[in-house]
Design a protein with these regions (language model features):
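HIT superfamily nucleotide-processing domains
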Residues: 1-112
Length: 112
């Protein structure tokens, strides 16, 4: 697991690593995923480092609500408001970057 100083998302939020920004304010940054798995695949991250969504929820519930609101706004702009919002939490759930982030996915129905 990376430390905060080694966190790639912290570096993106600080502008040390470039990204394709979709939205930014003083609390969050949204950018296109480098390896999209949907027509629209955007990541919404808090600028402050939290390991996962549970840390955000415990420390700052208003920030978690803001992340969801930003995701909804992106989905409305990019794909008429139909979207999936995914938080992978923990290694076994597929979390590969241990900085809380939401995946905003649009464009395809999930297989039944």
């Amino acid at each position: 697991m990376e430390s905060e100083k080694d966190c790639v998302f912290c570096k993106i939020a600080a502008g040390e690593i470039p990204s394709q920004k979709v939205y930014e304010d003083d609390r969050v940054l949204a950018f296109k995923d480098l390896h999209p798995v949907a027509k629209v695949h955007v990541l919404v991250i808090p600028k402050k480092h939290y390991r996962d969504v549970w840390e955000v929820a415990a420390a700052d519930p208003d920030l978690l609500a803001h992340i969801v609101e930003v995701a909804q706004g992106i989905a409305r702009k990019e794909y008429n408001g139909s979207y999936r919002l995914v938080f992978n939490t923990g290694l076994d759930a597929g979390q590969t970057v241990f900085h809380a982030h939401a995946h905003v996915l649009t464009g395809e129905r999930m297989a039944e």
